[in-house]
Amino acid sequence: MQHFMPASLIAILALAVPAHAQSGGAGHDSAYVRVFDNCTSYQAEDEPVHFSDCAGYGDWTVHIVAGEHGAAVAYSQRGKVTQWGQNPPRAAVFQDLGQVMEWRLDASGAPFATIYRSIFTGYERGDGGQYLTVAALRPDGEVGACHVAYIEAAQQPNANQIARDAADYLAPGWQCGIEEPIVFDLDSEMDVLTIAAQRRPGH
């Protein structure tokens, strides 16, 4: 596994033609793109930090800032710094991004959320963990996207489905800049659908 070191950043970026997958809640579908092949990358002056602007799904742009120990993701050109301030729980010192990003599509085929994997490793065997980050996309908002949920993915066998449920049932109505992301792990008292039901008007 490669870490986000300056010499290795571009080597791990890969993006392919999207592949459509199974439907989810409310007639939603998924498109998968490999992270991140079609990118423009540059390094900050006097700092071991790299920035990459990558072609996402449709007309979306995915932005990455990556340093020696971690990385952050933002979407489109609006509010990148705000988005970079949101990150999943840090399970260990080093963070890699998974090679594939899932884009959740509405009935018209427009993306409204993404799911990507963060892989954490440490200095010792057994250190680390994985989280799936669910981000709500806001094409007309002041900030292009915001985080909705973090799903612990190393111990939960149904983590991918939990992430899709969070994207489908929480992301569309999520209040970016107001609501804090929810962590779903083995200790969570409520699942996504229960929280979604409580968020409906009148509840």
Question: What feature does the model see in each segment?
Answer:
Residues A16-P18, Q198-R199:
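Short alpha-helix boundary/capping motifs
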Residues E152-H203:
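C-terminal partner/receptor-binding element of secreted or periplasmic proteins
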Residues Y42, Y57, A149-Y150, E179:
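General secretory precursor processing signal
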Residues P88-P157:
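Short helix/strand-capping turn motifs
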Residues A7-A16:
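Bacterial N-terminal signal peptides
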Residues R34, V49, G141, Y169-A171:
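Disulfide-bonded cysteine motifs in exported proteins
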Residues H3-F4, V17-N87:
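Charge-rich, low-complexity N-terminal segments
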